[in-house]
Amino acid sequence: MHTPVPRLHRFPGRPALLAALLPLALACSQTRDTSHDACPPEAPALATGGAPHALKTVFVIVMENQDWSDVAGSPSAPYVNGTLLPAFAHALDYRTGGLHPSLGNYVWLEAGDPLGIHFDAPPADVPLPVTCHLATYLEDVGLTWKAYAEGISGDTCPLVNEGKYAVRHDPFVYFEDVSGRPFDPHSARCIAHVRPFEELASDLAAGTVPRYAFIVPDVCDDGHDACPPLNDPVGQQDAFLAREVPAIMDSAAYRDGGVILIVWDEGHRGDHPIGLIAVSPLAKPGYAAPGAYTHGSTVRTVQEILGVTPLLRTAATSASLSDLFTAYP
């Protein structure tokens, strides 16, 4: 005789059980792997010896969520294709290993590794006790840095989304040595270094721009969202770059060994190549670098230009972007 198999929906407690398990499942999906948190045994130091560096000041601008094939040759990006690519160098094979979504990629650009983050969350949900990351390395050896973020007031440490400011695109505030333990919106270190984007122009004009400047556009200018009047993420990115890159290029900091690294955080289809453009008086004009690169390459390049050791995590095993320049570092 056939005995019917009971169906789950016949159990009256099933909805309550699912409701109880859902928070646990979400918590597990947002648990980061801490196995890469360890710091190198060496203390941060400035490299000594050798010739003076040709490259001296680094600006990083991060764009959002486009494969390179969506940007290269696109009629929505006339500034990138008609001005930047003919005059400067770019990478053909820059990838993130298929890492999604945003936060892990931004942390990678600061710490040399995603630090086990494969989800988006505010700092309160993913505090990073790690002390070996670029900002702290630079301060430890006496070099200056700032993040310039659109849409923040500068009166507090911007630990939550606000208007068009996305906190997940601002990696510095996730580190407890920057934002406090527990996180503190009044953290003096954070407020001193994470500044409104508008201050970049005055710092450039006054000659007080830091040696390392990380630029955080809002979710319209970085192309994360489709925003009016263009309603075209690639077009929005291009318009922002066309407006802001020339302003940086007009500064003494750029003319005297400056480099602007324009990088996309991730693609939107698996692990296809994403964009990396090196804008500098010392970039190879019109050059398309064939090498394989990652966010670890960007971190390595920043460290080598600024002369800061030891190399952070994947920066130690990634190729630098030296091939994109006529003189390096």
Report the location of each language-model feature.
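C-terminal motif of bacterial Sec signal peptides marking the signal peptidase cleavage site
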Residues: 25-27
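N-terminal secretory signal peptides that target proteins for export/translocation
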Residues: 1-12
